[in-house]
Regions:
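Conserved pre-catalytic core of RNA-dependent polymerases
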Residues: 1-49
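Short, charged alpha-helical motifs in flexible N/C-terminal segments and linkers
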Residues: 107-118, 123-125, 221-244
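Mobile genetic element proteins and their domesticated derivatives, centered on retroelements
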Residues: 6, 19, 32, 51, ...
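Active-site palm subdomain of RNA-directed nucleic acid polymerases
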Residues: 56-86, 90
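Short, conserved non-catalytic motifs in the polymerase core
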Residues: 30-58, 86-92, 162, 184-187, ...
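Basic, alpha-helical interaction scaffolds
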Residues: 143-213
Length: 244
C-alpha cells in the first residue's frame, strides 16, 4: 500500500526504487541482542520502519488521505501518530450521528490500508461551556464506547471540557515551582547574571509556552502566575522587593 501511495505521489525514478528497496521485506531483517548473545535474523514484513530519518515522511504519506474520508464539516488533524477528529455540534441528534459515521469511515479506511488504531488509547472530550453536554456515546472500532474524559493534553497544553485553562495554569505553576526549587538548591550564587540566565533558559519558556492560547483574564489565575515569578525574583540580589 505504501509503495502504491509513493507512485501516486509521483515518487519514482531512482528515489522511488531506493525507497522500495528500503521497504522490501527481503532486505529488512532484525535481530535482538541480550547480554552479548545475538538472536537469528528475522524478516520485518510490515509497518513503516521506525527510528530512521525517512520514517516520519513515509508515515505522513501513509496517512495523507485519511482526512478525505470524513464529511466537510468534520476536521481531522494528526501529529506524529496521534490523530484527532473534531466536529462542532449544533444539532445534537444529527451532528452526533454524522461524527460517528465519520469515525466509522476512518476505521474502514484503516482496514483498507492495513493500519490499526489502538482502541485502548481512544479518548473523547466534549468541549461544552454550558452546564450539560450531549450524552451521545461514540464507538471504537470494536464497538465499545470510547472513554470520555474531562480534559486532554494536546501538544503540552491541557484542554478542559469547560473550555477553561484553569487546569493547565495549575500544572504550569506546579512544574515551574518545582524547577525553581531545583535551581535554588543547585546554584548558590544569587547574582543577577546567574539567576536571570537560569530564569530565561530554564523557567520562562515553561511559563510562556503557548501563552497566546491560554493567557488568563481572571485575577486569580494572574496572581498565581505572578506569585511564581515573585518567588524567584525575591532570591535575586538587588531584586528582592521588585514591584509587580
Amino acid at each position: 500500500m505504501l509503495l502504491h501511495k509513493l507512485k501516486e505521489a509521483k515518487v519514482t525514478g531512482k528515489i522511488g526504487k531506493w525507497i522500495a528497496a528500503f521497504l522490501n521485506s527481503d532486505h529488512r531483517r532484525q535481530a535482538v541482542a541480550v547480554e552479548g548473545v545475538m538472536s537469528s535474523l528475522s524478516p520485518v514484513i510490515s509497518g513503516v520502519p521506525q527510528g530512521t530519518v525517512i520514517a516520519p515522511v513515509l508515515f505522513l504519506l501513509m496517512i495523507s488521505d485519511m482526512a478525505r474520508e470524513v464529511s466537510s464539516c468534520t476536521r481531522v488533524s494528526s501529529f506524529v501518530d496521534d490523530t484527532q477528529v473534531k466536529k462542532g455540534i449544533k444539532d445534537v441528534a444529527n451532528d452526533c450521528l454524522t461524527l460517528q459515521s465519520d469515525l466509522q469511515a476512518i476505521y474502514d479506511w484503516a482496514d483498507d490500508v492495513g493500519c490499526q488504531f489502538n482502541s485502548k488509547k481512544f479518548e473523547c472530550v466534549r468541549y461544552w461551556p454550558g452546564t450539560e453536554s450531549p450524552e451521545q456515546p461514540y464507538l471504537s472500532p470494536d464497538g465499545t464506547p470510547i472513554q470520555e474524559k474531562s480534559h486532554l493534553r494536546d501538544l503540552g497544553v491541557e484542554l478542559s471540557d469547560d473550555c477553561s485553562f484553569n487546569l493547565h495554569i495549575e500544572n504550569v505553576v506546579t512544574i515551574v515551582s518545582k524547577l525553581i526549587g531545583w535551581v535554588l538548591r543547585t546554584f548558590r550564587s544569587r547574582t543577577k547574571l546567574v539567576m536571570l540566565t537560569c530564569w530565561s533558559s530554564l523557567l520562562q519558556s515553561r511559563l510562556d509556552y503557548c501563552s497566546q492560547l491560554w493567557s488568563p483574564s481572571d485575577q486569580a489565575s494572574i496572581t498565581k502566575l505572578e506569585a511564581v515569578a515573585r518567588h524567584f525574583t525575591c532570591h535575586i540580589e538587588g531584586m528582592e522587593g521588585k514591584n509587580y
